[in-house]
């Protein structure tokens, strides 16, 4: 029996609701977001809060992070001083934390300046890849020891699981969808688009800049379990180039291994990408942090599912230049969110 089944999806859907509450966010003096943990809470990591000054004047306030019940975080609050439009990461140490089976942690962050208080509630996940080398054969049974990150869009569920070893980075994306459309010469088709970026990178806002990311597209060929990987961007790729619908055959990346299967209404995209071309910017080692985000393309169903939305990026962090265009994609009215979401490499989930 497959370890990531439709039943598992149903239980996760009932037990987890990712949410964010911050009324009138655009009018508030600061914006708040708790980042995903990059190692398991039980190991005592740091929790990071992003604070952005949204007003034209300097901001000085106190930031408090309320963890799940039974946890202990220090300090209780920290002062932040921000210049106009400045953003800072504020760290809190998790002295006592517990791992949740469904990898969902309810937190609340508060910014207080005088009589003005901003509150945001989120459910955050641990986004980290344990050390293991899976066989890329379309069978997800080997992925039970990976850390599952789950989200729901349009009533359909998606789960991400990752592994790493010294030679490769591996990814399993389980997509609940009504039908699977394989790659074809014309018309929209299903796929998974992922962006991997160094921890010191930033997405530019001008097309004359470079991509500064490694970006890939996974798709089913329409035959058996065969899948293809296309390399849409490398760090030196001009962003203007990424906004053209280039011929995918010229972008096929044969160094990656891909398998695609479908069982009980769930499509499984399984892929292994070599670290060698990325090693100069992302060195594979325990404790390494980098950026990873995923778009799921379901053109005849939910449309685009964006991990950045679930991870709590702010509405103004949508950026068309963060993702490459490609023939067969069906984009929504709004651009997708930025691709700079924290991810980590760890030894094990135990």
PLM feature segments, named:
Residues 5, 14-15, 147, 165:
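N-terminal leader/targeting signatures
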Residues 42, 85, 102-103:
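Beta-strand-connecting loops/turns
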Residues 1-9, 94:
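N-terminal secretory signal peptides that target proteins for export/translocation
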Residues 27-48, 79:
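Beta-sheet-dominated interaction scaffolds and their linkers
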Residues 71-98:
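Intrinsically disordered, low-complexity Pro/Gly/Ser/Thr-rich segments with frequent PxxP/GP/PP motifs
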Residues 11-22:
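Bacterial N-terminal signal peptides
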Residues 34-38, 50-55, 92-350:
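Structural preference for beta-rich elements and adjacent junctions enriched in aromatics
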Residues 54-70:
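Short acidic, flexible loop segments centered on an aromatic residue
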């Amino acid at each position: 029996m497959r370890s990531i089944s439709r039943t598992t999806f149903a239980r996760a859907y009932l037990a987890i609701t990712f949410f964010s509450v911050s009324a009138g966010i655009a009018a508030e003096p600061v914006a708040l977001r708790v980042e995903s943990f990059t190692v398991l809470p039980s190991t005592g990591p740091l929790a990071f809060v992003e604070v952005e000054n949204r007003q034209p004047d300097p901001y000085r306030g106190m930031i408090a992070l309320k963890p799940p019940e039974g946890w202990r975080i220090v300090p209780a609050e920290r002062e932040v001083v921000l210049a106009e439009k400045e953003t800072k990461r504020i760290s809190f140490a998790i002295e006592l934390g517990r791992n949740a089976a469904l990898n969902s942690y309810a937190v609340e962050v508060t910014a207080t300046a005088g009589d003005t208080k901003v509150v945001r509630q989120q459910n955050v996940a641990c986004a980290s890849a344990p050390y293991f080398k899976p066989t890329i054969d379309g069978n997800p049974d080997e992925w039970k020891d990976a850390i599952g990150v789950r989200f729901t869009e349009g009533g359909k569920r998606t789960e991400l699981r990752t592994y790493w070893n010294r030679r490769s980075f591996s990814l399993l994306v389980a997509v609940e969808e009504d039908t699977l459309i394989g790659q074809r010469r014309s018309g929209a088709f299903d796929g998974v688009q992922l962006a991997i970026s160094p921890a010191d990178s930033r997405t530019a806002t001008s097309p004359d800049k470079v991509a500064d990311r490694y970006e890939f597209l996974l798709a089913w060929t329409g035959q058996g379990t065969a899948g293809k990987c296309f390399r849409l961007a490398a760090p030196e790729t001009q962003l203007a180039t990424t906004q053209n619908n280039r011929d995918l055959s010229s972008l096929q990346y044969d160094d990656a291994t891909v398998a695609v299967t479908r069982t009980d209404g769930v499509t499984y995209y399984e892929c292994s990408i070599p670290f060698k071309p990325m090693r100069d910017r992302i060195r594979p080692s325990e404790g390494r942090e980098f950026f990873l985000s995923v778009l799921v393309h379901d053109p005849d169903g939910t449309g685009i599912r964006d991990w950045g939305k679930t991870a709590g990026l702010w509405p103004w962090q949508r950026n068309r230049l963060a993702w490459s265009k490609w023939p067969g994609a069906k984009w929504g009215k709004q651009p997708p969110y930025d691709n700079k979401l924290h991810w980590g490499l760890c030894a094990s989930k135990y």
